[in-house]
From Swiss-Prot:
The lineage of its organism: Bacteria, Pseudomonadati, Pseudomonadota, Alphaproteobacteria, Rickettsiales. It catalyses: tRNA(Pro) + L-proline + ATP = L-prolyl-tRNA(Pro) + AMP + diphosphate. This is Proline--tRNA ligase. It comes from Rickettsia peacockii (strain Rustic). One of its GO terms (cellular component) is cytosol. It is an enzyme of class 6 (ligase). Belongs to the class-II aminoacyl-tRNA synthetase family. ProS type 2 subfamily.
Length: 426
């Protein structure tokens, strides 16, 4: 992509309305723009990141055997009345009437609707297990939306729902999804800690939250110091990780620790995923019954699995940034390479830049080619801000000798590379 043809409305100054780093950087780098309190338009750069995260999550759900569906944003209120949640959910639920006076709502979650789909289409234990997921926009009318997309009113979620004949099988499915979550966050290039947690309004009695460590996190989590080894050794077996202690603040009890208090550390975390074993709460209330192997009608056992796709964008930035801007993990970066031509009027610079651009594009490496008239200092500031993992810098002096500079955004290390060797280094 040529920067001269791209839509990248960067801001030089910090926006006064932004409180946390991710919100500031998302506005400054031209990823989003606010349309109303807690509601944002995703501009090209931000949407690329959002789609990259979405695709990685989708891949891991598919690997876990989950099947993708797409449920509507707008839900009939009678399903929520039937499940018993309509009056209990509170003012966060946006409700309205259509022209026929039917009460509808903008779905904040989908347990009720997926239970309705299940009960009308699956009747026998022979059709189990089933695990269905969708990626859809949700709305919760937060009383005080803040921190940009971290706590907005409109947000993109991946929600999965599993159905099993009994608790034993349901827990097996839950454990499979736990592993899928660990793998998904690894693939996203983030360090997420699974902690024992409360189920909240969803219900149920088995639950884990997944937190990314960040100083701006709203929750305090307590965890075994072994988790810190995940940063340097991401290939640790998931079963081993599952045996390590980690708990949300409301579940942390010093006198009931399975390991010594000295082995525990605490950090602020941003919750980016939550999985629940719900049991038969919804199936009982909504009469979602199936025939078991003895022909007896029995309520289905359910679990729910959520990942905040749009929130992840902000959380990843909080954990991967410096004073200059964003430092994207390669897996989610909107562009893997920023190609910076410092003098677009120098024929040799143009020759090397176009050569590199073609080679990168031919290898399906996403590259943003800065072919603008901006000054070198402005170009460096822009590309440090948007956070491409690698920068190829082409200036007249080195270009004369077929040399380009390759900068690693995370370490800041710059090395001179002969242009013909560029692809082997990248």
């Amino acid at each position: 992509m040529l920067l001269s043809k791209y839509f990248l409305p960067v801001l030089k100054e910090e926006p006064s309305e932004a409180q946390v780093t991710s919100h500031k950087l998302m506005l400054r780098s031209g990823m989003i723009r606010q349309q109303a309190a807690g509601i944002y338009t995703w501009l090209p750069l931000g949407l690329k990141v959002l789609k990259n995260i979405e695709n990685i999550v989708r891949l891991n759900m598919n690997k876990a055997g989950a099947l993708e569906v797409l449920m509507p944003c707008i839900q009939p209120a009678h399903l929520w009345m039937e499940s018993g949640r309509f009056d209990n959910y509170g003012k966060e639920m946006l409700k309205f009437q259509d022209r026929h006076d039917n009460t509808l709502l903008f779905g904040p979650t989908n347990e009720d609707m997926i239970t309705d789909i299940f009960r009308h289409n699956i009747k026998s234990y022979k059709d189990l297990p089933k695990n269905l997921y969708h990626i859809q926009w949700k709305f919760r009318d937060e009383i005080r939306p803040r921190f940009g997309v971290m706590r907005g009113r409109e947000f993109l979620m991946k929600d999965a729902y599993s159905f099993d004949i009994n608790e034993e099988n349901a827990v097996k499915t839950y454990n499979q999804m736990y592993k899928a979550y660990i793998n998904a966050f690894r693939d996203l290039g983030v360090f997420a800690i699974p902690v024992i947690a409360d189920n909240g309004p969803i219900g149920g009695n088995l639950s884990h939250e997944f937190h990314i460590i960040a100083e701006t996190g709203e929750s305090t989590i307590y965890y075994d110091k072994k988790f810190k080894t995940l940063k340097d050794n991401p290939d640790i077996d998931v079963e081993e990780i599952k045996s390590w202690y980690a708990a949300a603040e409301e579940k942390y009890e010093v006198n009931k620790l399975p390991i010594s208090e000295q082995e525990i550390t605490s950090s602020k975390g941003i919750e980016v995923g939550h999985i629940f074993y719900i049991g038969s709460k919804y199936s009982v209330n909504m009469n979602a019954l199936i025939n078991d192997e003895y022909g007896k009608l029995t309520p289905i056992e359910m679990s729910s699995y959520g990942i905040g796709i749009s929130r992840l964008v902000a959380a990843i930035i909080e954990a991967n940034c410096d004073e200059k801007g964003i430092i994207w993990p390669s897996s989610v970066a909107p562009f893997k390479v920023s190609l910076i031509n410092l003098n677009i009027h120098d024929s040799k610079c143009v020759e090397l830049a176009e050569m590199a651009y073609k080679e990168l594009s031919d290898k399906n490496i996403e590259v943003l080619y800065d072919d603008t008239e901006a000054r070198p200092g402005s170009k460096f500031a822009t590309h440090d801000l948007i956070g491409s993992p690698h920068q190829i810098i082409i200036g007249p002096k080195k270009a004369a000798n077929n040399i380009v500079a390759l900068k690693d955004r995370k370490s800041g290390v710059i090395e001179d590379i002969e242009v013909g060797s560029l692809m082997s280094v990248l």
